[in-house]
């Protein structure tokens, strides 16, 4: 499996991340997971470099301070130079990585199938801290300021069905919310006050960032195995019922359902002010009106 670099890009979305043109410290572009890119691509993108790896790269790649970080199915976590693609360091773990890493304050945060979340030094890969959960972690983590603005928090989901908020410096648990089934998708942090994610129990959850208490719960028609996409107070997601759904986060009301053919939607959507864009198992990219579905 190879990692490719085409161009550098950044997000305009507000969050805990430093806004540098070549920085992409959280998968999906920012805390809200809108999937938007703040710069355009050239007409004919050039491949700058390629890195050969020993396993499949399942999770997204992130970038901070000219360092590219990614995990793979062989249990290798790798950091390479953004400009040249040369390896800076590599660490081997006992289990594989499906989750995307996130980077903040010179620290890499990544969940592993060994049931642990790791905080590692960006420049060396050395341990800072780790916590153990009750099942594998396939979802990426998110980064946000605490509601009082005095600290930074990690928000994470796991296959144990638990959404957790942790102190980014120490790993200390701030709160947790338990569901009945595994959670496979990265949680979105919206407007600095909501935590949003879908679960394998068919529900879309909106939690209060401050204490993890549920605010709204939208019932879908099948397991939600992917990450949601948000923009403003709007959220979209796909599921195994072969549908894409759109809802209002403030009211918790389902606004529309979209279906085309009998193929599930397992990819994370991108959302802007007009449309929802999502890839389906039918090998197509679907562009859906955000207003009407």
Question: For each predicted feature, which ranges?
Answer:
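Sec-dependent N-terminal signal peptides
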Residues: 1-4
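C-terminal motif of bacterial Sec signal peptides marking the signal peptidase cleavage site
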Residues: 6-8
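Bacterial signal peptide processing site
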Residues: 10-12
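Repeat-blade elements of multi-bladed beta-propeller folds
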Residues: 18-29, 54-77, 91-118, 131, ...
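Blade/loop signatures of beta-propeller domains
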Residues: 18-48
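N-terminal, post-signal-peptide region of Sec/Tat-exported proteins
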Residues: 43-59
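A short beta-strand motif characteristic of beta-propeller blades
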Residues: 47-51, 86-91, 126-131, 172-177, ...
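Short loop/turn segments that connect beta-strands within beta-propeller blades
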Residues: 81-84, 121-124, 167-170, 208-212, ...
């Amino acid at each position: 499996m190879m990692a490719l670099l085409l161009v550098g890009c950044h997000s305009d979305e507000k969050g805990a991340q430093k806004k540098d043109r070549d920085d992409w410290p959280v998968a999906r572009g920012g805390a809200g997971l809108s999937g938007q890119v703040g710069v355009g691509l050239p007409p004919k993108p050039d491949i700058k470099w390629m890195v050969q790896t020993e396993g499949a790269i399942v999770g997204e790649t992130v970038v901070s301070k000219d360092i590219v970080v990614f995990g793979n199915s062989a249990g290798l976590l790798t950091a390479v130079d953004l400009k040249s693609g040369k390896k800076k360091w590599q660490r081997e773990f006992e289990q594989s990585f499906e989750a995307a890493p996130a980077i903040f304050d010179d620290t890499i945060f990544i969940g592993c199938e060994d049931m642990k979340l790791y905080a590692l030094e960006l420049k060396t890969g050395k341990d800072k801290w780790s916590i153990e959960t009750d099942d594998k972690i396939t979802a990426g983590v998110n980064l946000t300021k605490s509601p009082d603005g005095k600290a930074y928090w990690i928000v994470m989901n796991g296959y144990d069905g638990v959404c957790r908020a942790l102190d980014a410096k120490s790993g200390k648990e701030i709160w947790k919310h338990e569901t009945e089934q595994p959670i496979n998708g990265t949680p979105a942090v919206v407007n600095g006050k909501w935590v949003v994610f879908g679960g394998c129990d068919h529900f879309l959850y909106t939690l209060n960032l401050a204490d993890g208490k549920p605010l709204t719960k939208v019932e879908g028609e099948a397991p939600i195995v992917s990450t949601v996409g948000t923009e403003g107070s709007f959220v979209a997601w796909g599921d195994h019922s072969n549908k894409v759904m759109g809802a209002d986060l403030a009211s918790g009301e389902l606004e529309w359902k979209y279906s085309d053919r009998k193929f599930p939607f397992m990819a994370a959507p991108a959302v802007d002010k007009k449309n929802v864009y999502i890839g389906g198992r039918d090998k197509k990219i679907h562009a859906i009106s955000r207003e009407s579905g």
